[in-house]
Amino acid sequence: MQSKSIPDITCTESNTTRRKFLSRVSLSTIPLALAFANEQPLSAKPVKPDLGPRNFDLAAKNPHQSGTATAMISMFMQGGPSQVDLMDPKPLLNKMHLQKFPEKIKYDNAAEASSRIFGTPWKFKQYGQSGTAISELLPGLSEIVDDVLVIRSMHTGVNNHGQSIHAMNSGRIQEGRPALGSWMTYALGSETRQLPAYVAMTDPQGLPVLGVLNWSNGWLPSLYQGTVIRPVEPRILNLNPPTALRGKTQENFLSLLKQLNGQHHQRRNRELELAARRTNLELATRMQSAAANALDISKETKATHEMYGINNPVTEEFGKRCLIARRLVERGVRFVQLFTKNQYWDHHGSLQTRLPASCQKIDIPAAALVNDL
């Protein structure tokens, strides 16, 4: 007599293919595998999930395996820079310069503009003890090359900006998953109560593809979403109260508000969005003095400003953001991500002028940040 819960895996030459056999065998092992994973007999009652309220917070947590790093700064420069002109030299391209490509080209979403080979017009040189080849377009990077890992084998199964960016930031091409910064703050918490645990620093010329999804908490509680620091002053809006509400007046108001919010949350302790808003409001209060101090780069030395390129109009904006990123992690912020504008490296033409311009803006400040850390 056959069991109704386990599929029939009887095989005959007339009715079973290899695919059917493997499918039936795999299905029949599911109850056994689940029982083994849960360390319980097949006859045991199902384990009830814990549906009680969970406590999510930003308290600092110890990782399963200790490491030397306590924070991360990500310089996310969206687009596809010409690797053969920057960090992946191809001498054969120069030998075949302006020749017609001898093989067939499979075009996708790019126009069939040309089938001629174009060698790089820029010189490469090996730098550091590693001997890594770097283009003359990146003099700052060449000075810190031994502190940099160059990966030349990365690829993705999609060629659209949106999916690729989401894969880089969240690990999957599908939207809706938490960004890397959200996972880090969820797993490790924060080492400061005066500043956000996760900061996104945007570009004055606009957001990258997918916009705010780049620092989204996905299905994690809103507590782990990135906090935006603007590229222009005031970098954080509405941080300081009106003059009439400052001092004791504000303290009394916030004290009463905290009490009312606490009572409201006790009656709705499963509402994670409510808990996140309450936590963020209390954080905003503490940030009034701490954020102003962290964002004030005037306290840095003249030499530091010069190192980050802040005295140069071309590198000033990105240099300021790099310096602020360093000041944030020094004060306990767990994850800081700097974004460039939409399609920053997406050069579909005029490469000989547009690629150097993109390099000039970010090369010196980015190298200074790595060197300064």
Model-derived regions: residue spans:
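Ligand-binding pockets and gating/stacking loops
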Residues: 2-373
